């Protein structure tokens, strides 16, 4: 079977909720990144075999967000394109699907990523209204809360699953706040030093007062500190420990990779960035959905015949500080490493608590960031993983191509 390479990895800067990117629909956001990838690689879009797009909040965004991305990016009608929705894992599952298709010999060049406008999520009326509503009030549901942030099996917010992990692993509020502040500090340092410049595609947003070029992550909180974090009230549970300050945000953004087989790399004279060595997808109890990376990482490492200790850089999506700390504790126990070892290699440029979590794009965003950091530092192996609402996780093991 062919090796699978990533030959391009790009994303938008991440926008705040109702922030700079909010005027753009997810199809438009994604298309801007895909178009940039095509231009930078010089690949003829007609040679792309398929486009796979993770997207969670599709209701009201018109037919086929994945297809919208492809057509708006100038990819010919003859190239198939489709969407994938496994909640937060969508942007990474698109990569896993592309990887599998190339391995199976069904494709040679695949664009895979994710796009999300949480700002653009609509409100939903119950389907029963189609049968006639004779009297009494009607309640609209928030598409974002219902379809991205609420557990379908216990009708609880994702924040409660983080509270469950905090309780199970005895993770204190102080530990969570310290973790969150560390994420903010690292992200701000990365933004200010231009660390993300190579991975970000500038997005031009039409404005009556003049077009805006958006090329810098706008979500990091420069005004926070431990004292301010400590004053925040629990967001999901009375006397709980999960707050708006130690959880990820609601965000907009898009992120994509171009994957290629060995044959395509040679045929089109492409330059590989990394090889995708293995993938993993696993499941856990939905009540502790944030622990999903643990089985996913276990599977990915086993397939790669590698140990956690072989990973020199790790991107772990920070849905919640409690969730991340729970995963770190479990992985340290399972793989015989210390918490300090793990934290030194993980999210070195900050994570979703600081940068944001556009749900359909995040799994791809952490992969893009990991790839660029691997190229900058020259490390051999990297690992990316994230949790998924409903109790799952996905993971990728990457190898630097030097």
Residue ranges and their predicted role:
Residues 1-61, 65-73, 80, 161-173, ...:
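Conserved active-site "lid/cap" helical segment
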Residues 84-116, 166-195, 256-263, 328, ...:
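Active-site-proximal alpha-helical scaffold in enzymes
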Residues 1-24, 36, 140, 226-291, ...:
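Condensing-enzyme catalytic core mediating Claisen C-C bond formation in acyl metabolism
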Residues 109-164:
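Flexible glycine-/small-residue-enriched beta->alpha junction loops
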Residues 10-12, 23-32, 40, 175-267, ...:
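N-terminal extracellular/periplasmic Venus flytrap/periplasmic-binding protein-like
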